[in-house]
Amino acid sequence: MSSETWELIQKMSVKDAELQLALQCAPLIAGLKVSNLLILDRSGMESVKRILSGSCISFFLLAMAEHKVTLLLYQEKKLSDYLAEERNREFLQRYGYGEMDLQNILRAFWVRYQAHLQKKEDFPHEMGILLGYPVEDVEGFILHKGKNYLCAGYWKVYVN
């Protein structure tokens, strides 16, 4: 990153929706990931809607708190194709997902995520699949309870 870019970023408000979108979702925007979580101030929601309208990136509201929102941003075709891969489809079916089209999966995940936020259910680890993580690593994370991984970056790697 150039010093000019760094200086520009430093002058921006951390509450700025455009900055948060760029910082948190750069791999998605660049087409390197199928999806990404975006957590930002509620006040930035309209800016995100405006920025994403007409783009190839869609969003799904996962949670809205008093001051924050959590969105799943995704490229619809890429995420649909990823979820349709046999290993991912089988994983989701084992976790109770029946209808395998993207919108039904997102709605079912929302229900499970809300139950977790309300402390009624454990964390829905299938989020890893929705974020495009390899199913082997999601299964490894569940099996090893987040420990004994080979390496960690954006996610914890359990299988080489």
Can you annotate each of these PLM segments?
Residues 45-105:
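A glycine-rich, hydrophobic loop/mini-helix early in the fold
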Residues 151-160:
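Accessory, usually C-terminal, subdomains that scaffold auxiliary metal cofactors
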Residues 33, 63, 106, 142:
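Conserved catalytic core of nucleotide polymerization and phosphodiester-bond processing enzymes
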Residues 96-125:
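Internal catalytic-core helix/loop-beta-alpha segment
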Residues 33-35, 67-69, 124-126:
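Short, surface-exposed beta-edge/turn micro-motifs
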Residues 123-150:
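Hydrophobic/aromatic-rich, well-ordered segments within soluble, folded domains that form packed cores
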Residues 1-39:
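Short, extreme N-terminal leader segments that mark the start of a protein/domain
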Residues 22-31, 59-63, 114-118:
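Short, flexible, solvent-exposed loop/turn segments with mixed acidic/basic and small polar residues
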